[in-house]
């Protein structure tokens, strides 16, 4: 199984986010999951990569050259790909994966996650999207997405695009049991 993980590059966040990331990384290694991530050495990206590498797991970093030039890259990650743009990076994140996991993060993580949700809504991405809601971090996003449906900005079927889980141990099971998504989802992307 190959999973893309979106997550924070901040080192100043509460330790509980690092602990949850470490647990998830160990679950990935235990289940022979190959992880694709943003390639960073700091914050949750660093914790994810370091834990996977320390436990002999598989991980690939993808980062734009301009970020690498300011030395944001995790030098411990051997499988590393540089891109020309942020857009190219996001395209590569979603290629040949079996699922997508979003850990808590800032505007970069949110932007990546919302783009994946949009692509799935349009049938351009069909894999499970699991959002790890550590400490209720994503509750406001969950409420906003639900409001999009209740206010009819999105179709009620779109509630099946994503899943929220509270614990790292729930992530892989949620990916395995997620309903398949219709590649013809564009037919109901517009709420007529």
For every predicted segment, state its role:
Residues 53, 120-127, 153-154:
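Arginine/glycine-rich "motif VI" loop of SF2 helicases in the C-terminal RecA-like domain
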Residues 39, 63, 83-84, 103-105, ...:
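Short beta->alpha connector loops at strand-helix junctions that form conserved
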Residues 1-96, 135-169, 173, 180-192:
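A cross-family phosphate/adenosyl-ligand binding-site feature
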């Amino acid at each position: 199984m190959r999973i893309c993980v979106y997550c924070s590059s901040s080192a100043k966040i509460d330790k509980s986010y690092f602990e949850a990331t470490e647990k998830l990384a160990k679950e990935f290694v235990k289940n022979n999951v190959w992880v694709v991530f943003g390639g960073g050495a700091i914050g949750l990206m660093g914790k994810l990569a370091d834990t996977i590498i320390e436990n002999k797991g598989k991980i690939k970093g993808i980062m734009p050259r301009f970020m690498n030039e300011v030395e944001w890259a995790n030098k411990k990650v051997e499988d590393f790909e540089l891109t020309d743009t942020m857009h190219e990076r996001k395209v590569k994140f979603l290629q040949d994966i079996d699922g997508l996991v979003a850990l808590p993060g800032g505007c970069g993580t949110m932007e990546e996650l919302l783009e994946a949700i949009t692509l799935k809504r349009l049938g351009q991405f069909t894999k499970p999207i699991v959002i790890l809601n550590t400490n209720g971090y994503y509750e406001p996003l969950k409420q906003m997405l639900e409001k999009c449906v209740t206010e009819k900005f999105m179709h009620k079927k779109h509630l099946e695009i994503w899943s929220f889980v509270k614990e790292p141990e729930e992530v892989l099971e949620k990916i395995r049991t997620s309903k398949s998504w219709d590649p013809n989802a564009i037919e109901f992307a517009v709420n007529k």
